[in-house]
Amino acid sequence: MIERLDVVEEPRKEWDLRMEIASAPRSGAVVATLRDAEVRRGGFTLGPVSLQIDWADRVAVTGANGAGKSTLLGALLGRVPLTAGQASLGSGVLIGEVDQARKLFHGEESLLDAFCAAVPDTEPVEVRTLLAKFGLKSDHVLRSAGTLSPGERTRAALALLQGRGVNLLVLDEPTNHLDLPAIEQLESALDAYEGTLLLVTHDRRMLDAVHVTRRLDVADGKVTER
């Protein structure tokens, strides 16, 4: 039975099946807000920042390494404590973060078992099909999740977001560790995604390929919309 499933689930070649990222039911009109927000860490200060992200905004966040891009994301999502000001999330916001999802695939259990534990209402056969869409074939699903390469772990995380459905998709340098076919599939999936998007990237190709409605530039802890 398992062998038969492997044959049915196996795509003819990697990335043959179309990658998608499912949208959950929409959130409220206001997704996230910062009001005079500041974050101080050692000698670094982000802000003060006043910023509102609305439903279906597609926001690219750019800036040099160490400029404060990830700190800005953490402040918006309520993960980074503020030194001053206020942060709030809107009603009905379902956050999907690739970096957080990747952390679920580091243990000794198989990729299939780890994935099924994260989406308990999804049948294993459906999980196999979903993973195959993201280039993780039958020889990946029974391996220990901890043996996945960084790129395979990112694919598994993207597949998990597809399985769960999100309405605020957060991607922090998503092209790291992905090969070109995977990047192209991701770009296509992002174009079809209908929720709110926060995309942090220094990849000029992705910035040109993915439709965004707003751009935030972070430099020396200051945030400028352009």
Locate each region found by the language model.
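ABC transporter TMD-NBD coupling linker
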Residues: 1-18
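ABC ATP-binding cassette signature C-motif
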Residues: 15, 22-226
